[in-house]
Curated annotation (Swiss-Prot):
Reactions accelerated catalytically: RNA(n) + a ribonucleoside 5'-triphosphate = RNA(n+1) + diphosphate
Gene: rpoZ
SUPFAM superfamilies: RPB6/omega subunit-like (SSF63562)
Pfam families found in the cross-reference section: RNA_pol_Rpb6
Enzyme class, first EC level, given as a word: transferase
Single annotated GO MF: DNA binding
Keyword Calcium in record: no
Organism: Picosynechococcus sp. (strain ATCC 27264 / PCC 7002 / PR-6) (Agmenellum quadruplicatum)
GO cellular component, one term: DNA-directed RNA polymerase complex
Lineage: Bacteria, Bacillati, Cyanobacteriota, Cyanophyceae, Oscillatoriophycideae
Name of this protein: DNA-directed RNA polymerase subunit omega
């Protein structure tokens, strides 16, 4: 039985590519996504909005939405 997800994997890949292209350092943006995902995981451990959306995917979506804020991408 296949589970239906509430997000499109192609859209997630596109957003991740946009993050990588906007960043000056691929390693740094990867670490920032991982840190945000880890932080969100512990902050919202009890309040699960969408159990199918994992913290790294949520972090990619949030960070791609914040591309207009340069402090998110890096110095």
């Amino acid at each position: 039985m296949q589970k239906r997800s509430s997000f499109d994997s192609a859209e997630i890949m596109h957003r991740a590519e946009d993050l990588m292209q906007a960043a000056s350092n691929r390693y740094r943006i990867t670490v920032q996504v991982a840190q945000r995902a880890k932080r969100r995981r512990y902050e919202e451990f009890d309040a699960v909005e969408d159990p199918l959306m994992k913290p790294p995917i949520r972090a990619i979506i949030e960070m791609s939405d914040e591309l207009t804020q340069p402090e998110i991408i890096g110095e």
